[in-house]
């Protein structure tokens, strides 16, 4: 779970548009759908989930 230089743009996207950060990390999977739903329901939960996905994978 080390952070690489490729993770920095993903984190920037995760702060601005959380689904984009998840898409760059996992592609078009159920993780993207969950992130979109969380972002619609509340911006902060979407950011937290996106950062979790980027750190976990």
UniProtKB/Swiss-Prot annotation:
<dbReference type="Pfam" id="PF01679">
    <property type="entry name" value="Pmp3"/>
</dbReference>
<keyword id="KW-0812">Transmembrane</keyword>
<feature type="transmembrane region" description="Helical">
    <location>
        <begin position="3"/>
        <end position="23"/>
    </location>
</feature>
<keyword id="KW-1133">Transmembrane helix</keyword>
<comment type="similarity">
    <text>Belongs to the UPF0057 (PMP3) family.</text>
</comment>
<dbReference type="GO" id="GO:0016020">
    <property type="term" value="C:membrane"/>
</dbReference>
<feature type="transmembrane region" description="Helical">
    <location>
        <begin position="36"/>
        <end position="56"/>
    </location>
</feature>
<dbReference type="InterPro" id="IPR000612">
    <property type="entry name" value="PMP3"/>
</dbReference>
<keyword id="KW-0472">Membrane</keyword>
<protein>
    <recommendedName>
        <fullName>UPF0057 membrane protein T23F2.4</fullName>
    </recommendedName>
</protein>
């Amino acid at each position: 779970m080390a952070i690489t230089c490729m993770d920095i743009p993903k984190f920037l996207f995760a702060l601005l548009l959380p689904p984009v950060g998840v898409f760059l990390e996992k592609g078009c999977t159920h993780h993207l759908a969950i992130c979109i739903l969380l972002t619609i329901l509340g911006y902060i939960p979407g950011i937290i989930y996106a950062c979790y996905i980027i750190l976990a994978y």
